Amino acid sequence: MVDQGFFTLKKEKKKNILIKLFYVKILGFCFCDSWSSSDMAHSLTSLAVFQSVIRKEMVRSLHVYESVEIEREFWFKSKSCYVEKKAKPLFRSEDFRRPEISEGSVFGTWRCIFVFRFNHSLPRFPTLLCLSRNPKLEDIPNLANELKFISELKPSKIYEEEQCSSSTEGYYNSDLPKPRKLVLKQDLNCLPDSETESEESVNEKTEHSEFENDKTEQSESDAKTEILKKKKRTPSRHVAELSLEELSKYFDLTIVEASRNLKVGLTVLKKKCREFGIPRWPHRKIKSLDCLIHDLQREAEKQQEKNEAAAMAVAKKQEKLETEKRNIVKRPFMEIGIETKKFRQENFKKRHRASRAKKNQESLVTSSST
């Protein structure tokens, strides 16, 4: 008797729900006083939300409760509360087909931004319809309660049927015998009768592959040791102890050669130069001064035989250049003087003229000999 009473109660509840849904269908927009939006959400089978392409603040929603379809329109005001408006049926017309609804699809001036179907994978909520990000949705409970109901659904409930179907398929497939893979044991390069020859060739191939693997392993180990050697950094104490006097010993060399002799990395040496206020390694300045001094020495030797006064003037120039070189070694941030730059340019022109004259003489000699 208890069971029968229980079933009769269930039937009565179902009848009440159907009656209320019938009233909802007739009224279209308004709900009965006894029927709350939260109760309605539990019977929701699908929901589609559309946004106007022309007016972004206008939003429409199509709610399907078992066999009843309700269409609503909302006004998403930016500066004030959201409002629900009376909606004329637009998506419930005979021309409109429900299966065609998908996220991103456009129907006239309305674009679909959200689609939910029961027993389907949960959709992604846009920021406009996300309750945590958009608290104004609470102003329109008819939409907010249903969005809350969808967000609270667990994926396990929705995927239950899909998982069952996949598991049953897997179970039935496991009973079936797996197809065997065909493997050719015969070497295609040899005749079918010559089994011994094919075995020998296989052995040779395996030995060759093992030898190659050993080679690759050795090369990899060598590369690792080289990397480890390169990665060894100079101790910080050695770098800190480097003074300007030590650096000045190698100013006549290039910066790369100097870093090798000092047993310091190139970047470390450059950093040290910046600390001492050296913007550029003074190798070129000192080299150019050395060349000029060497040229003046030659001139002085020549002038001593002809004219002593000219030789004395050359010697004075030489002394000036030597003092300038010493100053640059002491203070490498110094630039070469204007007079020395002019003298360097003149010296370069002299050399160039001499080399051209020499070439012309050689060409004349060759032409006369022919």
Curated annotation (Swiss-Prot):
Record bears the keyword Transport: no
Subcellular location: Nucleus
InterPro entries: RKD-like, RWP-RK_dom
Coiled coil: 283-328
Domain of life from the UniProt record: Eukaryota
Biased composition (Basic residues): 349-358
Composition bias type Basic and acidic residues, residue spans: 202-228
Gene Ontology biological process terms in this record: regulation of DNA-templated transcription
Protein name (database record): Protein RKD5
